[in-house]
Amino acid sequence: MAIEVSVLRVFTDSDGNFGNPLGVINASKVEHRDRQQLAAQSGYSETIFVDLPSPGSTTAHATIHTPRTEIPFAGHPTVGASWWLRERGTPINTLQVPAGIVQVSYHGDLTAISARSEWAPEFAIHDLDSLDALAAADPADFPDDIAHYLWTWTDRSAGSLRARMFAANLGVTEDEATGAAAIRITDYLSRDLTITQGKGSLIHTTWSPEGWVRVAGRVVSDGVAQLD
């Protein structure tokens, strides 16, 4: 039986360009044992399997898979799934993932999630001194035993930076927009940020000294795909 995959792009710019592709699948249609194979088949950096909220509930449950493995938390899948649920007419306040309970909110065309900084995977953070150095970085030059987050300021006073992320350890050579890495860099710098990542994806973060980081972005739909 063919499985329907809603294809989204998460963290687009204000014109709906760029963004990180995401597959969203109704978890009731797929046995847990089959999810990893489907995530690998889909080819997205992450695929999220969502258990829809019960009638009258504002909580959903989800699991997240890269092409290689299941992970307890990721940013762009939780933002994307939260947007997808609102589009279906079932907006939520919380999304339960293996790492914990993600807080969800909606602000105009922005969908936001709040998560603990320690839920995000560990990244090797590389502070670079110029946009040229960032652009010249080659994923092949970085060890594949950990994800690498490269960044440089574009406007330090405004909290604006440019970033790239390499995650060969998760089966992703370069990720276009990484919510979990945005959480880590926000916690690392202890300030609100506007992050342009990859080709032009846009992520907004809000830092809290209590260990929570809010990640917000725009989402667009690229239609529906079928997996056999």
Curated annotation (Swiss-Prot):
Domain of life: Bacteria
InterPro entries: Phenazine_PhzF-like (IPR003719)
Gene Ontology BP term (one): biosynthetic process
An annotated GO cellular component: cytoplasm
Molecular functions per Gene Ontology: isomerase activity
Pfam families per record: PhzC-PhzF
Protein name: Uncharacterized protein Rv2716
